[in-house]
Amino acid sequence: MVVMDTLANALSAIYNAEIRAKKEVVVWPASKLTLNVLKVLQREGYIGEFEYIDDGRWGKIKIQLLGRINKIGVIKPRYPVKHRELAEFPEWLKRYLPAYNIGVIIVSTPYGVLSHKEAVEKQTGGVLLAYCY
């Protein structure tokens, strides 16, 4: 089976498990990008612990859910943004978050995968990957 977008597959599996009030979900195939996005979601308090399980093929990720996610998804196409655009909360960003201080936009920056708040603090731009609130 060929999965075109592993990040979109993982986030949709998390969302589906979350709306069905599951306590954990197993996501496969695993990728470095998916693991880095999960680290940001864990830092922001949306998910609990997660662990990588090496099954000899693609790998799996077992994620503990906390029931705090209302909506999660990828941003397609992946827009490049400057840090000023993230700080000002432009109109197009309102399509993904209900308000500036509610939720998180996940950004791939030269400093790694960060939340939009961390990217503004480090004054760096990047490519928008996903949103969660």
Curated annotation (Swiss-Prot):
It comes from the Archaea. GO terms for biological process: translation. InterPro entries: Ribosomal_uS8, Ribosomal_uS8_sf. Pfam families: Ribosomal_S8. The keyword Ribosomal protein applies. SUPFAM superfamilies: Ribosomal protein S8. The keyword Disulfide bond does not apply. GO terms for molecular function: rRNA binding; structural constituent of ribosome. Keywords: Ribonucleoprotein, Ribosomal protein, RNA-binding, rRNA-binding. GO terms for cellular component: ribonucleoprotein complex; ribosome. HAMAP family: Ribosomal_uS8_A. One of the primary rRNA binding proteins, it binds directly to 16S rRNA central domain where it helps coordinate assembly of the platform of the 30S subunit. Belongs to the universal ribosomal protein uS8 family. Part of the 30S ribosomal subunit. This is Small ribosomal subunit protein uS8. It comes from Desulfurococcus amylolyticus (strain DSM 18924 / JCM 16383 / VKM B-2413 / 1221n).
